[in-house]
A protein has these predicted regions:
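Glycine-anchored, exposed beta-strand/edge motif detector
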Residues: 2-133
Length: 133
């Protein structure tokens, strides 16, 4: 068994990354994305159930309209300043954004997306969403 950082098992066996996915030009590395009906990744937003249906986190953009999306596992070192004591949620105000505080307004959707693994990496997992009512 391969380990990283002491005795923590390597997460390589639990990695799911979708490669060369068509994406909107506004999508950026580190963004939480959802898929449109025509199969294009767009920035997700916790303002409605439809917009908050997150597929994963963009890890790489080969072109302005082609990206790799992490669905499960530890991301590449694409972030800065993550706090390992905080759960990350989908932002209700910044398209594709991550927040350390869950949305609380009526109609917004609480979507837990993952846990920082280090200051630069995130363990991506998607839990059930909760629509605030």
């Amino acid at each position: 068994m391969t380990t990283i950082r002491g005795n923590i098992p390597s997460p390589n066996n639990a990695n799911v990354v979708l490669t060369n996915v068509p994406c909107d030009s506004t999508v950026y590395v580190g963004a939480a994305v959802r898929m449109t009906l025509v199969g294009v990744a767009v920035n997700a937003l916790a303002d409605s159930a439809e917009n908050a249906n997150v597929l994963g986190i963009v890890e790489f953009k080969a072109t302005s309209t082609l990206c790799n999306i992490r669905v499960l596992g530890v991301t590449e070192k694409i972030f800065t300043g993550l706090d390992v004591t905080k759960t990350l949620f989908l932002s209700p105000t910044v398209p594709g954004g991550l927040a350390t505080v869950p949305p609380t307004s009526v109609g917004q959707v609480m979507v837990p997306l993952g846990q920082p693994f280090s200051a630069t990496e995130m363990l991506v997992f998607k839990r059930d969403s909760v629509i605030r009512g």
